[in-house]
UniProtKB/Swiss-Prot annotation:
Protein family according to the UniProt entry: Belongs to the alpha-ionylideneethane synthase family.
Function per UniProt: Alpha-ionylideneethane synthase; part of the gene cluster that mediates the biosynthesis of abscisic acid (ABA), a phytohormone that acts antagonistically toward salicylic acid (SA), jasmonic acid (JA) and ethylene (ETH) signaling, to impede plant defense responses. The first step of the pathway catalyzes the reaction from farnesyl diphosphate to alpha-ionylideneethane performed by the alpha-ionylideneethane synthase abl3 via a three-step reaction mechanism involving 2 neutral intermediates, beta-farnesene and allofarnesene.
Entry keyword set: Lyase, Virulence
Enzymatic class: lyase
Name the record gives this protein: Alpha-ionylideneethane synthase abl3
Taxon lineage: Eukaryota, Fungi, Dikarya, Ascomycota, Pezizomycotina
Upregulating conditions: Expression is induced during the early biotrophic stage of development. Expression is positively regulated by the ABA cluster-specific transcription regulator abl7.
Keyword Translocase: no
Gene name in the database record: abl3
Amino acid sequence: MLLYNSFTEGLKFTKTKILLRYYASALIDVPRDDVIEDAGVSKSQAMQNIRDRWYYPPDLANDLQDLDMPKAMKQEIFACAWEYTRCVIPQYTNWPRYVAFMRIIIIGIVAEFRGNLVDVTAGDDMMGYNLSTVLDALFLGTADRENMCREYRSFLLITADKSSERRNGELFRRYVNALAHSPRQWFRMRDADALARFTIAASLACNDLDDLKFSNMEYEILTEIGDTLYDAVAFFKHRSEGETNSTFAYMPPDMRVEAFHQAREVLWAMDVALAPKTTLQGVINFVRFFGGPIHMMMRRYRFVEEHLTIGQVETEKVVDQTRKNFKLWNRLDAKDAKAGDEKRYKDIVSNNSGEVMFPGLVEFLENEDNCPDCCFRESYGAETKHQFGGVQICSACREEWGRYMKSLPDRAVKAFPELAYVLSIP
């Protein structure tokens, strides 16, 4: 392995161990008996005391100093940010930008389960970071800087509301309603929620491809493929969280395997079609790794705990652990509450939308021309086990979503004409 002599001045390599600070602490879950039996493994073979050692670069070791949170949880957050960064942007040429991306992911992880600590409408200073400074460290001098800064602030706005008491506000109610409006609108909102196009742009920045940017149509296809693949694999994880933002809460769930297969086919075809464009390797790598392999390689997921399987139906134990933020997950349980705080919503739309909402989001939120047969609520979250937390759409809408899913190859060719020949190969 190699030694990073300097993480701040670039990479200098020598033939010794990698200098990464690690901590060995958090005891994690023991595999469930039913999983062990289904896998054909005797209980005596199961690892009864799995301990994670959290590895991450020393650049992050002094972050979150002023945050009121257990040290072990901070270490897990740092390791999660490092692992995610390494998985979705495996190649890089610019270490300072790479570290900036890790810090952006750290802020996002906290927003996902401790939203009360993040309020992007209150200013740039949060958890010891200045958001503008961190975003500029990643995107300053790149072709899509302004849009990506808005994209990230939009992510923080909604994500922090979802995991805090602000979830019962008018903003989040309108947001969840808008998710179910149409499949194309869904994928644009899921794109922002997953930081999909944001990470594609970050991959370009971390490889010093400052002048390269994608059209909105190209982003739509790349992110739809990635989100479809990820959500198909994460189906039971999302249900255990009572998630509002999962593709197969709205797409027909019985088409999940078909949707994954089709998206994977289009991705491999795209990989062939774009192979001569070496500058796009990192983009395809992001979609590929985000679409499934991270569920095995990142300790944020339950691959080891569920004895090297993916897609186990969530149990009461898993749901209870999710409520306790095990693996930094977060549970959205339904609350008997009526949406309120309309003033905050109106203030954000009127005064801050150009900074904290991606282009088009205001129009999504303001349009309340909803299907009369779908089940919309005043407040969102899972009402029972094995249930998502968002709008329950009607059978006619599900059929429309299914048709949209099947049109992916045709829409992909319109965005990337190079695909036409590859997809036509019998």
